[in-house]
Amino acid sequence: MSVRMLTAPLILLVIGVAARAADPGDAAAGKAYFSQTCMQCHTADPAEGGGEIGPSLVGLYGRTAGVGDDRFAYSAALKGSKLVWTQETLDHFLTDPATAVPGTTMAVPVPMKADRDNLIAYFRSLSSGTK
């Protein structure tokens, strides 16, 4: 076998591993966690308005914090944070919302890293249209 024939599959393997590392989490597990924990306050259904207490999280990933659901009055702290919801900012915020954005009304942390990664994967799927 030639070196060229071995190199191409190796490159594809490395690219696949790198892509997986860039997108941690399992969207299906995140949806299950969301249903059990987050739906007490939020919704992720575009046909519904916000949740009972918090805003709809449809389209959250990639959006600026404090905007997106016109039916919800976001806190001045969240609106003033200028955060854009990415893997990193969501992970930091969900770890301890009150520390990440002092004055936010979001009070429930997600302490387990795997749960945060799964939730963020679910939020990404809601933003990309694949649930």
How would you describe each model-predicted region?
Residues 41-42, 127:
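Protein kinase-like catalytic domain
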Residues 42-48, 62, 95:
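Detector for the c-type heme attachment site
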Residues 11-21, 127:
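Hydrophobic h-region of N-terminal signal peptides that target proteins for export
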Residues 68-84:
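Short Fe-S-cluster ligation motifs
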Residues 48-71:
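N-terminal, post-signal-peptide region of Sec/Tat-exported proteins
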Residues 84-131:
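C-terminal capping alpha-helices of c-type cytochrome domains
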Residues 17-35, 45-50:
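Electrostatic cytochrome c docking/interface patches
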Residues 1-8:
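Bacterial N-terminal signal peptides that target proteins for export
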